[in-house]
Amino acid sequence: MKNWKTLLLGIAMIANTSFAAPQVVDKVAAIVNNGVVLESDVDGLMQSVKLNAGQAGQQLPDDATLRHQILERLIMDQIILQMGQKMGVKITDEQLDQAIANIAKQNNMTMDQMRSRLAYDGLNYSTYRNQIRKEMIISEVRNNEVRRRITVLPQEVDALAKQIGTQNDASTELNLRHILIALPENPTSEQVNDAQRQAESIVEEARNGADFGKLAITYSADQQALKGGQMGWGRIQELPGIFAQALSTAKKGDIVGPIRSGVGFHILKVNDLRGQSQSISVTEVHARHILLKPSPIMNDQQARLKLEEIAADIKSGKTTFAAAAKEYSQDPGSANQGGDLGWATPDIFDPAFRDALTKLHKGQISAPVHSSFGWHLIELLDTRKVDKTDAAQKDRAYRMLMNRKFSEEAATWMQEQRASAYVKILSN
Protein backbone atom coordinates (compact mmCIF):
# COMPACT_ATOMS: atom_id res chain seq x y z
CA MET A 1 0.00 0.00 0.00
CA LYS A 2 1.12 3.52 -0.69
CA ASN A 3 2.16 5.56 2.30
CA TRP A 4 -1.21 7.23 2.06
CA LYS A 5 -1.02 9.28 5.25
CA THR A 6 1.80 11.30 3.74
CA LEU A 7 0.49 11.81 0.22
CA LEU A 8 -0.34 15.47 0.75
CA LEU A 9 2.95 17.41 0.87
CA GLY A 10 4.73 14.62 2.70
CA ILE A 11 2.92 15.33 5.94
CA ALA A 12 2.94 12.80 8.72
CA MET A 13 -0.17 12.99 10.83
CA ILE A 14 -0.22 13.85 14.50
CA ALA A 15 -1.36 10.89 16.56
CA ASN A 16 -4.27 11.10 18.95
CA THR A 17 -3.97 11.62 22.67
CA SER A 18 -3.96 7.90 23.44
CA PHE A 19 -0.19 8.00 22.90
CA ALA A 20 0.30 10.33 25.86
CA ALA A 21 -0.45 9.76 29.51
CA PRO A 22 -3.46 11.94 30.44
CA GLN A 23 -1.84 13.32 33.58
CA VAL A 24 1.11 14.89 31.68
CA VAL A 25 0.72 18.62 31.09
CA ASP A 26 1.65 19.70 27.57
CA LYS A 27 4.84 21.72 27.30
CA VAL A 28 6.16 24.26 24.82
CA ALA A 29 8.97 22.88 22.65
CA ALA A 30 9.71 26.13 20.81
CA ILE A 31 8.51 29.72 20.62
CA VAL A 32 8.04 30.88 17.03
CA ASN A 33 7.30 34.61 16.73
CA ASN A 34 3.98 34.96 18.56
CA GLY A 35 3.16 31.25 18.39
CA VAL A 36 4.46 27.99 19.81
CA VAL A 37 5.31 24.44 18.85
CA LEU A 38 4.07 22.04 21.53
CA GLU A 39 5.80 18.93 22.81
CA SER A 40 2.66 17.00 21.84
CA ASP A 41 3.14 18.17 18.24
CA VAL A 42 6.71 16.89 18.24
CA ASP A 43 5.79 13.61 19.94
CA GLY A 44 2.85 13.04 17.61
CA LEU A 45 4.95 13.58 14.51
CA MET A 46 7.69 11.36 15.97
CA GLN A 47 5.13 8.56 16.39
CA SER A 48 3.84 9.00 12.86
CA VAL A 49 7.28 9.16 11.22
CA LYS A 50 8.27 5.97 13.03
CA LEU A 51 5.02 4.28 12.00
CA ASN A 52 5.47 5.29 8.37
CA ALA A 53 9.14 4.29 8.38
CA GLY A 54 8.25 0.89 9.79
CA GLN A 55 5.64 0.32 7.09
CA ALA A 56 8.09 1.39 4.38
CA GLY A 57 11.08 -0.51 5.80
CA GLN A 58 12.96 2.79 6.14
CA GLN A 59 15.79 3.03 8.67
CA LEU A 60 15.75 6.00 11.04
CA PRO A 61 18.49 7.86 12.91
CA ASP A 62 18.61 8.00 16.71
CA ASP A 63 15.71 9.73 18.49
CA ALA A 64 17.68 12.90 19.28
CA THR A 65 18.56 13.49 15.62
CA LEU A 66 15.06 12.62 14.44
CA ARG A 67 13.56 14.93 17.05
CA HIS A 68 15.76 17.82 15.86
CA GLN A 69 14.63 17.31 12.27
CA ILE A 70 10.97 17.12 13.28
CA LEU A 71 11.21 20.23 15.44
CA GLU A 72 12.81 22.19 12.59
CA ARG A 73 10.02 21.04 10.27
CA LEU A 74 7.33 22.10 12.74
CA ILE A 75 9.03 25.47 13.31
CA MET A 76 9.03 26.13 9.57
CA ASP A 77 5.40 25.05 9.32
CA GLN A 78 4.49 27.41 12.16
CA ILE A 79 6.26 30.33 10.45
CA ILE A 80 4.35 29.73 7.20
CA LEU A 81 1.02 29.20 8.97
CA GLN A 82 1.47 32.54 10.72
CA MET A 83 2.09 34.14 7.34
CA GLY A 84 -1.07 32.51 6.03
CA GLN A 85 -3.08 33.88 8.93
CA LYS A 86 -1.81 37.41 8.28
CA MET A 87 -2.57 37.04 4.57
CA GLY A 88 -6.08 35.77 5.28
CA VAL A 89 -5.56 32.45 3.51
CA LYS A 90 -8.58 30.20 4.07
CA ILE A 91 -9.31 26.63 3.04
CA THR A 92 -13.03 25.97 2.76
CA ASP A 93 -14.64 22.77 4.01
CA GLU A 94 -15.48 21.92 0.39
CA GLN A 95 -11.83 22.26 -0.68
CA LEU A 96 -10.73 20.20 2.32
CA ASP A 97 -13.27 17.45 1.65
CA GLN A 98 -12.18 17.29 -1.99
CA ALA A 99 -8.50 17.03 -1.03
CA ILE A 100 -9.19 14.19 1.41
CA ALA A 101 -11.40 12.44 -1.15
CA ASN A 102 -8.53 12.66 -3.65
CA ILE A 103 -6.14 11.10 -1.13
CA ALA A 104 -8.58 8.25 -0.59
CA LYS A 105 -9.07 7.79 -4.35
CA GLN A 106 -5.31 7.72 -5.01
CA ASN A 107 -5.10 4.81 -2.59
CA ASN A 108 -8.16 2.97 -3.94
CA MET A 109 -10.13 3.57 -0.77
CA THR A 110 -13.64 4.72 -0.05
CA MET A 111 -14.02 7.39 2.61
CA ASP A 112 -15.36 4.77 5.04
CA GLN A 113 -12.30 2.60 4.41
CA MET A 114 -10.06 5.60 4.96
CA ARG A 115 -11.74 6.43 8.28
CA SER A 116 -11.35 2.81 9.36
CA ARG A 117 -7.66 2.79 8.44
CA LEU A 118 -7.09 6.02 10.36
CA ALA A 119 -8.78 4.53 13.41
CA TYR A 120 -6.75 1.33 13.04
CA ASP A 121 -3.53 3.36 13.09
CA GLY A 122 -4.70 5.36 16.10
CA LEU A 123 -5.32 8.59 14.19
CA ASN A 124 -8.34 10.74 14.96
CA TYR A 125 -10.24 11.79 11.82
CA SER A 126 -10.90 15.30 13.09
CA THR A 127 -7.20 15.75 13.86
CA TYR A 128 -6.36 14.40 10.41
CA ARG A 129 -8.70 16.92 8.76
CA ASN A 130 -7.19 19.79 10.71
CA GLN A 131 -3.68 18.75 9.77
CA ILE A 132 -4.57 18.44 6.09
CA ARG A 133 -6.11 21.92 6.26
CA LYS A 134 -2.86 23.27 7.74
CA GLU A 135 -0.81 21.60 5.01
CA MET A 136 -3.05 23.07 2.32
CA ILE A 137 -2.57 26.54 3.82
CA ILE A 138 1.20 26.01 3.98
CA SER A 139 1.24 24.89 0.36
CA GLU A 140 -0.84 27.85 -0.84
CA VAL A 141 1.28 30.40 1.03
CA ARG A 142 4.56 28.90 -0.16
CA ASN A 143 3.37 28.54 -3.75
CA ASN A 144 1.99 32.08 -3.93
CA GLU A 145 5.01 33.71 -2.29
CA VAL A 146 7.57 31.81 -4.34
CA ARG A 147 5.82 32.05 -7.70
CA ARG A 148 5.57 35.81 -7.58
CA ARG A 149 9.37 35.92 -7.28
CA ILE A 150 9.77 33.92 -10.50
CA THR A 151 9.90 35.26 -14.06
CA VAL A 152 10.06 32.98 -17.10
CA LEU A 153 11.17 34.85 -20.22
CA PRO A 154 10.07 33.85 -23.76
CA GLN A 155 13.73 33.57 -24.76
CA GLU A 156 14.27 31.02 -21.98
CA VAL A 157 11.30 28.98 -23.16
CA ASP A 158 12.51 29.00 -26.78
CA ALA A 159 16.05 28.02 -25.78
CA LEU A 160 14.93 25.15 -23.57
CA ALA A 161 12.38 23.97 -26.12
CA LYS A 162 15.18 23.77 -28.69
CA GLN A 163 17.32 21.87 -26.20
CA ILE A 164 14.47 19.45 -25.51
CA GLY A 165 14.18 18.77 -29.22
CA THR A 166 17.88 18.14 -29.82
CA GLN A 167 19.31 16.51 -26.70
CA ASN A 168 19.17 12.77 -26.32
CA ASP A 169 18.42 13.07 -22.60
CA ALA A 170 15.56 15.55 -23.09
CA SER A 171 12.94 12.93 -22.27
CA THR A 172 14.87 11.21 -19.49
CA GLU A 173 13.03 10.96 -16.20
CA LEU A 174 14.84 10.31 -12.94
CA ASN A 175 13.69 9.10 -9.57
CA LEU A 176 15.85 10.88 -7.00
CA ARG A 177 16.60 11.22 -3.32
CA HIS A 178 18.14 14.45 -2.04
CA ILE A 179 20.16 15.64 0.95
CA LEU A 180 20.77 19.33 1.64
CA ILE A 181 23.55 20.41 3.98
CA ALA A 182 22.38 23.97 4.57
CA LEU A 183 24.48 27.09 4.92
CA PRO A 184 23.38 30.16 6.88
CA GLU A 185 22.87 33.47 5.12
CA ASN A 186 26.22 35.14 4.38
CA PRO A 187 28.29 32.17 5.61
CA THR A 188 31.91 32.54 6.64
CA SER A 189 34.59 30.59 4.80
CA GLU A 190 34.90 28.35 7.85
CA GLN A 191 31.18 27.55 7.77
CA VAL A 192 31.40 26.76 4.05
CA ASN A 193 34.39 24.48 4.59
CA ASP A 194 32.71 22.68 7.49
CA ALA A 195 29.54 22.11 5.46
CA GLN A 196 31.53 20.87 2.47
CA ARG A 197 33.48 18.43 4.63
CA GLN A 198 30.24 17.12 6.12
CA ALA A 199 28.70 16.74 2.66
CA GLU A 200 31.76 14.91 1.35
CA SER A 201 31.67 12.60 4.36
CA ILE A 202 28.00 11.80 3.68
CA VAL A 203 28.77 11.10 0.01
CA GLU A 204 31.48 8.68 1.07
CA GLU A 205 29.11 6.92 3.49
CA ALA A 206 26.44 6.63 0.80
CA ARG A 207 28.88 5.26 -1.77
CA ASN A 208 30.08 2.74 0.80
CA GLY A 209 26.55 1.37 1.15
CA ALA A 210 24.96 3.42 3.93
CA ASP A 211 21.17 3.78 3.73
CA PHE A 212 20.61 7.04 1.83
CA GLY A 213 17.15 7.52 3.30
CA LYS A 214 18.52 7.28 6.82
CA LEU A 215 21.30 9.73 5.95
CA ALA A 216 18.68 12.17 4.62
CA ILE A 217 16.53 11.90 7.74
CA THR A 218 19.64 12.37 9.89
CA TYR A 219 21.39 15.25 8.15
CA SER A 220 19.25 16.90 5.48
CA ALA A 221 17.76 20.37 5.95
CA ASP A 222 15.43 19.90 2.98
CA GLN A 223 11.64 19.73 3.40
CA GLN A 224 11.68 16.12 2.12
CA ALA A 225 14.12 15.00 4.81
CA LEU A 226 11.52 13.13 6.87
CA LYS A 227 10.57 11.17 3.73
CA GLY A 228 14.14 9.95 3.40
CA GLY A 229 14.89 12.71 0.91
CA GLN A 230 12.55 11.17 -1.65
CA MET A 231 11.89 13.58 -4.55
CA GLY A 232 10.03 11.12 -6.78
CA TRP A 233 9.99 11.11 -10.59
CA GLY A 234 10.77 14.16 -12.69
CA ARG A 235 12.35 15.11 -16.00
CA ILE A 236 15.93 16.26 -15.91
CA GLN A 237 15.02 19.74 -17.21
CA GLU A 238 12.62 20.25 -14.30
CA LEU A 239 15.54 20.18 -11.90
CA PRO A 240 17.66 23.19 -10.94
CA GLY A 241 20.29 23.82 -13.60
CA ILE A 242 23.18 22.77 -11.38
CA PHE A 243 21.45 19.43 -10.75
CA ALA A 244 20.62 18.84 -14.42
CA GLN A 245 24.23 19.37 -15.45
CA ALA A 246 25.56 17.03 -12.77
CA LEU A 247 23.00 14.35 -13.66
CA SER A 248 23.49 14.46 -17.44
CA THR A 249 25.59 11.27 -17.42
CA ALA A 250 24.26 9.69 -14.21
CA LYS A 251 23.21 6.06 -14.04
CA LYS A 252 20.88 4.14 -11.75
CA GLY A 253 22.35 3.88 -8.25
CA ASP A 254 24.80 6.78 -8.69
CA ILE A 255 25.52 9.14 -5.80
CA VAL A 256 26.04 12.64 -7.22
CA GLY A 257 27.59 15.55 -5.37
CA PRO A 258 28.29 17.47 -3.29
CA ILE A 259 26.83 20.24 -5.49
CA ARG A 260 27.21 23.80 -4.18
CA SER A 261 24.29 26.24 -4.46
CA GLY A 262 23.32 29.46 -2.75
CA VAL A 263 21.65 27.59 0.11
CA GLY A 264 24.21 24.87 0.77
CA PHE A 265 25.60 21.58 -0.52
CA HIS A 266 23.37 19.05 -2.26
CA ILE A 267 23.78 15.29 -2.57
CA LEU A 268 21.62 13.24 -4.94
CA LYS A 269 20.99 9.54 -5.33
CA VAL A 270 19.60 8.23 -8.63
CA ASN A 271 17.06 5.56 -7.65
CA ASP A 272 16.02 4.86 -11.23
CA LEU A 273 15.80 6.29 -14.77
CA ARG A 274 13.30 5.92 -17.58
CA GLY A 275 12.85 7.38 -21.07
CA GLN A 276 9.93 8.66 -23.09
CA SER A 277 9.34 9.28 -26.78
CA GLN A 278 9.80 12.91 -27.80
CA SER A 279 7.52 12.75 -30.85
CA ILE A 280 4.05 14.05 -30.04
CA SER A 281 1.15 13.85 -32.46
CA VAL A 282 -2.54 14.59 -31.98
CA THR A 283 -5.64 13.68 -33.95
CA GLU A 284 -7.49 16.61 -35.46
CA VAL A 285 -11.02 16.41 -36.83
CA HIS A 286 -12.67 18.30 -39.66
CA ALA A 287 -16.38 18.60 -38.89
CA ARG A 288 -19.43 20.65 -39.66
CA HIS A 289 -22.68 21.08 -37.80
CA ILE A 290 -26.14 22.57 -37.77
CA LEU A 291 -27.17 24.21 -34.49
CA LEU A 292 -30.74 24.86 -33.36
CA LYS A 293 -31.25 26.72 -30.09
CA PRO A 294 -34.43 26.15 -28.06
CA SER A 295 -36.49 29.32 -27.77
CA PRO A 296 -40.03 30.46 -26.91
CA ILE A 297 -41.06 29.53 -30.46
CA MET A 298 -39.12 26.23 -30.62
CA ASN A 299 -38.80 23.99 -27.57
CA ASP A 300 -36.29 21.17 -27.05
CA GLN A 301 -38.44 18.48 -28.59
CA GLN A 302 -39.29 20.60 -31.63
CA ALA A 303 -35.60 21.42 -32.20
CA ARG A 304 -34.66 17.75 -32.04
CA LEU A 305 -37.47 16.73 -34.41
CA LYS A 306 -36.52 19.48 -36.86
CA LEU A 307 -32.93 18.20 -36.97
CA GLU A 308 -34.18 14.65 -37.56
CA GLU A 309 -36.20 16.00 -40.49
CA ILE A 310 -33.16 17.87 -41.87
CA ALA A 311 -31.01 14.75 -41.52
CA ALA A 312 -33.56 12.70 -43.45
CA ASP A 313 -33.62 15.29 -46.25
CA ILE A 314 -29.80 15.26 -46.48
CA LYS A 315 -29.67 11.46 -46.62
CA SER A 316 -32.41 11.32 -49.27
CA GLY A 317 -30.62 13.89 -51.43
CA LYS A 318 -33.29 16.58 -51.16
CA THR A 319 -30.67 18.98 -49.82
CA THR A 320 -27.02 19.06 -48.87
CA PHE A 321 -25.54 19.48 -45.42
CA ALA A 322 -23.96 22.80 -46.42
CA ALA A 323 -27.21 24.17 -47.84
CA ALA A 324 -29.18 23.09 -44.77
CA ALA A 325 -26.61 24.69 -42.47
CA LYS A 326 -26.82 27.99 -44.33
CA GLU A 327 -30.63 27.89 -44.15
CA TYR A 328 -31.23 26.63 -40.62
CA SER A 329 -28.11 26.79 -38.43
CA GLN A 330 -28.13 29.32 -35.60
CA ASP A 331 -24.35 29.26 -35.16
CA PRO A 332 -23.28 32.66 -36.57
CA GLY A 333 -19.65 31.59 -36.74
CA SER A 334 -20.17 28.66 -39.11
CA ALA A 335 -23.60 28.92 -40.76
CA ASN A 336 -22.38 30.97 -43.74
CA GLN A 337 -19.58 28.43 -44.28
CA GLY A 338 -22.09 25.61 -44.55
CA GLY A 339 -21.57 24.70 -40.90
CA ASP A 340 -17.84 24.08 -41.47
CA LEU A 341 -15.88 24.18 -38.19
CA GLY A 342 -12.47 23.67 -39.80
CA TRP A 343 -9.71 21.50 -38.37
CA ALA A 344 -9.52 21.26 -34.58
CA THR A 345 -8.71 18.86 -31.77
CA PRO A 346 -11.89 17.32 -30.31
CA ASP A 347 -11.16 18.54 -26.80
CA ILE A 348 -12.00 22.15 -27.69
CA PHE A 349 -15.68 21.27 -28.15
CA ASP A 350 -18.48 20.96 -25.60
CA PRO A 351 -18.18 17.52 -23.91
CA ALA A 352 -21.46 16.18 -25.36
CA PHE A 353 -20.53 17.46 -28.83
CA ARG A 354 -17.01 16.03 -28.50
CA ASP A 355 -18.21 12.60 -27.37
CA ALA A 356 -20.67 12.32 -30.25
CA LEU A 357 -18.08 13.53 -32.77
CA THR A 358 -15.40 11.05 -31.72
CA LYS A 359 -17.82 8.13 -32.26
CA LEU A 360 -18.52 9.06 -35.90
CA HIS A 361 -16.88 7.52 -38.95
CA LYS A 362 -15.69 9.65 -41.85
CA GLY A 363 -18.74 10.92 -43.79
CA GLN A 364 -21.20 9.86 -41.08
CA ILE A 365 -23.91 12.20 -39.76
CA SER A 366 -24.91 11.98 -36.11
CA ALA A 367 -28.34 11.77 -34.57
CA PRO A 368 -29.38 15.05 -32.93
CA VAL A 369 -26.99 15.81 -30.05
CA HIS A 370 -27.87 18.03 -27.10
CA SER A 371 -25.14 20.26 -25.63
CA SER A 372 -25.00 23.37 -23.49
CA PHE A 373 -25.49 25.41 -26.69
CA GLY A 374 -28.58 23.62 -27.99
CA TRP A 375 -29.21 20.79 -30.47
CA HIS A 376 -26.64 19.80 -33.10
CA LEU A 377 -26.52 17.73 -36.23
CA ILE A 378 -22.85 16.80 -36.74
CA GLU A 379 -20.99 15.42 -39.75
CA LEU A 380 -17.41 14.17 -39.53
CA LEU A 381 -15.68 15.12 -42.78
CA ASP A 382 -12.16 13.83 -42.10
CA THR A 383 -9.46 13.17 -39.50
CA ARG A 384 -5.71 13.62 -39.57
CA LYS A 385 -2.62 13.16 -37.42
CA VAL A 386 -0.73 16.39 -36.76
CA ASP A 387 2.78 16.70 -35.32
CA LYS A 388 2.50 18.98 -32.30
CA THR A 389 6.00 18.31 -31.02
CA ASP A 390 7.14 21.95 -31.26
CA ALA A 391 4.11 23.32 -29.42
CA ALA A 392 4.31 20.55 -26.83
CA GLN A 393 8.02 21.17 -26.33
CA LYS A 394 7.41 24.87 -25.67
CA ASP A 395 4.64 24.04 -23.22
CA ARG A 396 6.86 21.49 -21.51
CA ALA A 397 9.78 23.94 -21.49
CA TYR A 398 7.69 26.57 -19.72
CA ARG A 399 6.53 24.10 -17.07
CA MET A 400 10.07 22.79 -16.59
CA LEU A 401 11.45 26.30 -16.17
CA MET A 402 8.73 27.10 -13.64
CA ASN A 403 9.45 23.90 -11.71
CA ARG A 404 13.20 24.45 -11.85
CA LYS A 405 13.01 28.07 -10.72
CA PHE A 406 10.41 27.21 -8.09
CA SER A 407 12.68 24.56 -6.61
CA GLU A 408 15.63 26.96 -6.48
CA GLU A 409 13.63 29.93 -5.19
CA ALA A 410 11.64 27.94 -2.62
CA ALA A 411 14.81 26.90 -0.79
CA THR A 412 16.01 30.51 -0.70
CA TRP A 413 12.61 31.82 0.39
CA MET A 414 12.32 29.32 3.23
CA GLN A 415 15.84 30.10 4.38
CA GLU A 416 14.93 33.80 4.47
CA GLN A 417 11.74 33.18 6.46
CA ARG A 418 13.57 30.99 8.98
CA ALA A 419 16.35 33.58 9.41
CA SER A 420 13.95 36.49 9.89
CA ALA A 421 11.67 34.74 12.40
CA TYR A 422 12.09 34.85 16.17
CA VAL A 423 12.67 31.25 17.26
CA LYS A 424 13.56 30.06 20.73
CA ILE A 425 13.90 26.32 21.28
CA LEU A 426 13.00 25.34 24.84
CA SER A 427 13.54 21.60 24.73
CA ASN A 428 16.46 19.38 23.83
Swiss-Prot record:
Catalytic activity: [protein]-peptidylproline (omega=180) = [protein]-peptidylproline (omega=0)
Heme listed as a keyword: no
Location (main, coarse): periplasm
Signal peptide start and end residues: 1-20
Pfam annotation, one family: Rotamase_3
Superkingdom as given in the UniProt entry: Bacteria
Gene Ontology process terms (BP): Gram-negative-bacterium-type cell outer membrane assembly; protein folding; protein stabilization
Gene3D superfamilies to which the protein is assigned, alphabetical: 3.10.50.40, Porin chaperone SurA, peptide-binding domain
Domain spans labelled PpiC: 171-272, 282-382
Record remark on domains: The PPIase activity resides only in the second parvulin domain. The N-terminal region and the C-terminal tail are necessary and sufficient for the chaperone activity of SurA. The PPIase activity is dispensable for SurA to function as a chaperone. The N-terminal region and the C-terminal tail are also required for porin recognition.
Name listed for the protein in its UniProt record: Chaperone SurA
Organism: Salmonella choleraesuis (strain SC-B67)
Protein's gene: surA
